[in-house]
Regions:
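Active-site metal-binding loops of divalent metal-dependent hydrolases
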Residues: 15, 44-45, 137, 169-171
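Sec-exported extracytoplasmic/periplasmic mature domains
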Residues: 35, 39-42, 58-68, 97, ...
Length: 256
């Protein structure tokens, strides 16, 4: 839900295997979830097949048909150790709500330190900049902590001129000690103890698994009006079908 009076609303979503696996009905369903936000950040856009970029274009087209005016950008494939690991990122935004300041870019300085280097974009609203790093970490058993440490160092070294918003799928929780460097610089997670991934099957009526998707922001430069994980599953009977959309919940934040 987006409240009145906010400055900007952002939603981040790891949409599993976002490409030809998503039919028109699924694209329409995704659009119905993200349509009320100003900026949409997507992880796991398929890189090895043009259908990944085409899926982003299809989603933007569906959003435009819903009444607002939207634009989008898609990253190049990440500079990953293998083509199986490489992905694209995407941003989609409401053009009457925010403007894109310049061409987004993969952060080359982090390409040797992260399996999938983050995708940077600066959006502006009412003369305030929002410098977004869109990121998908390596799996939890392959040391995503070292990637987060590299991201933290990059943000801290460049924080004077930037209003960093770090978002995505980090494959670690907000309580991992690797975040302490950012927390010491007044960065905070938008969600706490909020599970954001889906189990393969319900367990005693429970289908949420681990809290690894989040949005990190500077509380010196921003005030959070609201943050949430959007549960599009709602009940166990829907789990199998909804996992075809994604095995992650989207996470959102409204900033003053």
């Amino acid at each position: 839900m987006v409240l009145d009076g906010y400055a900007v609303s952002i939603i981040s979503w790891n949409i599993i295997d976002f490409g030809r696996t998503k039919d028109d009905q699924e694209i329409e369903f995704i659009a119905s979830i993200v349509r009320d936000f100003d900026i949409i950040a997507i992880q796991e856009v398929v890189a090895h097949d043009p259908a990944g970029a085409q899926a982003v274009a299809r989603l933007a087209d569906q959003l435009n048909r819903m009444g607002a005016s939207w634009d989008y950008v898609i990253s190049d494939p990440t500079d990953s150790p293998s083509s199986q690991i490489s992905e694209r990122y995407a941003y989609i935004w409401q053009t009457n709500k925010v403007s894109l300041s310049y061409e987004p870019m993969l952060v080359d300085k982090l390409s040797g330190l992260c399996d999938r280097e983050p995708y940077y974009a600066r959006f502006t609203r009412d003369d305030k900049d929002y410098d977004i790093l869109n990121f998908h970490a390596r799996p939890h058993d392959r040391d995503p902590q070292s990637e987060v440490q590299a991201l933290s160092n990059f943000i801290i070294d460049n924080q004077i001129r930037f209003n960093w918003i770090l978002l995505g799928d980090f494959n670690i929780t907000e309580e991992d000690e690797v975040w302490e460097a950012l927390y010491a610089e007044s960065f905070r997670p938008s969600l706490s103890h909020q599970k954001t991934t889906l189990k393969r099957a319900c367990d005693e009526g429970l289908y949420l698994n681990v809290p690894i998707d989040n949005i990190y922001f500077s509380e010196v430069k921003n005030t959070v009006q609201q943050s949430a994980a959007i549960d599009f599953v709602e009940r166990c009977e829907n789990l199998s079908e909804m996992r075809e959309i994604s095995d992650h919940l989207p996470v959102s934040i409204n900033l003053d």
